[in-house]
Design a protein with these regions (language model features):
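Conserved, structured core segments of small domains
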Residues: 1-96
Length: 96
């Protein structure tokens, strides 16, 4: 399991220009099952994605598809973690 923290490196006006394409990127990876949660930070300095993938290399490949990454307007911090406890609806993601 991975937490991907995005931090904008460009003004919000520039981020807005790529937002529709970024949302399509998110939709693609929700459909594939890789993304579980996402949302913007408050204050609006970036966003958070909770993802499920086989490896950090897979997450890095996925990030490479993000229009924010391709435009060079966000930095990404990837944190891998092993879920030990979950809400009942998320039990499939816990490592036993």
């Amino acid at each position: 399991m991975f937490i991907i923290a995005l931090t904008y490196t460009a003004p919000l006006e520039q981020v807005e220009q790529h937002l529709a394409a970024h949302r399509q990127f998110l939709d693609k990876h929700y459909q594939s099952g890789a993304f579980l949660f996402s949302g913007r930070k408050e204050p609006r300095t970036g966003g958070i994605i909770v993802a499920h993938a086989a490896s950090s290399a897979e997450i890095e490949r996925i990030i490479g598809e993000d229009p924010f990454h391709q435009a060079g307007i966000a930095d990404y911090e990837i944190t891998e973690f092993i879920p030990a406890k979950t809400a009942p609806d998320l039990a499939q993601y816990a490592e036993n």
